[in-house]
């Protein structure tokens, strides 16, 4: 069973679900929902600046410790 993580929010994606997006340069992005895909591809948002992503919470915890 191959469980993948969302390229935007970091949530785990079950097999046979989610979106697979391939850029022109050949890099592959996995998304759990349309919300994540639109935020990264269309709106060009950075995951560390969006409050509901795992990346944001990870960086916030690091700065809180320091």
UniProtKB/Swiss-Prot annotation:
It comes from the Archaea. PANTHER family: 60S RIBOSOMAL PROTEIN L24 (PTHR10792), RIBOSOMAL PROTEIN L24 (PTHR10792:SF1). This is Large ribosomal subunit protein eL24. Binds 1 zinc ion per subunit. One of its GO terms (cellular component) is ribosome. Binds to the 23S rRNA. A zinc finger (C4-type) spans 6-36. The keyword rRNA-binding applies. Belongs to the eukaryotic ribosomal protein eL24 family. InterPro entries: L24e/L24_sf, Ribosomal_eL24, Ribosomal_eL24-rel_arc, Ribosomal_eL24-rel_N, Ribosomal_eL24_CS, TRASH_dom. Its cofactor is Zn(2+). It comes from Picrophilus torridus (strain ATCC 700027 / DSM 9790 / JCM 10055 / NBRC 100828 / KAW 2/3). The keyword rRNA-binding applies. GO terms for molecular function: rRNA binding; structural constituent of ribosome; zinc ion binding. The gene is rpl24e.
């Amino acid at each position: 069973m191959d469980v993948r993580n969302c390229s935007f929010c970091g949530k785990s994606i079950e097999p046979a679900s989610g979106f697979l997006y391939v850029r022109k340069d050949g890099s592959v992005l996995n998304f759990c929902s349309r919300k994540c895909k639109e935020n990264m591809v269309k709106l060009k948002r950075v995951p560390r600046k969006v409050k509901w992503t795992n990346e944001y919470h990870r960086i916030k915890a690091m700065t809180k410790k320091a």
